[in-house]
């Protein structure tokens, strides 16, 4: 189904045949406005597809099925939502002039149902989610202490002046030449570790041995390069203090899960002797019990099993069928039983489900007539009484068994109770014979 992409709307004329009624539809398809990026909005009719069109037609048929009387269709004025489509249905007195070409020369009558349908697709605007790129976090500054301004970590590291550059070696004073040569090679070979540069003074460590005790000597040592010990030269820390020894990853405290266990000690010696071999008792062959030797419990169980297997044989009856009646002969009897059909239909019209008629369901009478005659009988009943969807069980399990019971009564000259009892007995006896002869369940007319 193709539509042009221009115009304010698209008009479609359609002619349907619903049962015995002719339905003339004039469909108005509204476009969907589509707006592209930095462009003007345009009308789009491509949302209507063949699949959606078939769903709209199915929704129209369901609307007709839910009508109790066909006369209510001439007063339709409703709105449906089918597959994200708003369907406006309104009955009119006159059809659209464009539908005259669909009538093939015939004129529309007053019995024709004229409908105006308006289709509008429910659109939903897209929402664009823009991710916000967070800015880089600045280094946290230290809190002001004693009225001084907070200084960043970078400034403090720069002022310390004790951080050696990577790949270079410092020249400490008062160090032997041998130790200097050994440490210079190890310092150049070690890579730079950023983690050690951020180690704070609060971690502890020994004080620098090169610092003097007097204030004057400490001021002089600040002007010149400080001497580093071999342990300080190996350290990459930005602090003037020595790097403490790395603590082992294993805690010296024993975990609580080993509280009830003895770790590292030998178990109390218990002599484990060989396990005694268990002698297996060989099964004793079962003895043949006689009825006289059985106790009360076994005898009662045997009696219950025997009663379960003892199925009573149904009453033997002659199986009566209606195989001599033809299709036209059966359908012509519809008007004879019309009053009985109307009475049962009024009683069960608003019931949610019908399971049987006088304890006779559809499966009990399915073998009395052929399959083709069954289908024609259901079709005839559906044309007259099937105005609502919940009447299916009433037709199959109510009206159809009633019709066959009436045929049984007239053919074999039986009363209603005799005909019902005959159908029940012959169904039970036929099932018993097929089970006795190991034959599959099938119709006697096949």
Swiss-Prot record:
Start and end residues of each stretch annotated as Disordered: 141-282
Biased composition (Basic and acidic residues): 194-210
Bias-annotated ranges (Polar residues): 159-170
Entry keywords, A to Z: Phosphoprotein
Keyword Ribonucleoprotein: no
Nucleus listed as a keyword: no
Compositionally skewed regions (Basic residues) per UniProt: 269-280
Modified residue annotations for Phosphoserine: 200, 202, 212, 214, 251, 282, 307
Biased composition (Low complexity): 211-221, 229-239
Protein name from the UniProt record: Uncharacterized protein CG4951
Origin species: Drosophila melanogaster (Fruit fly)
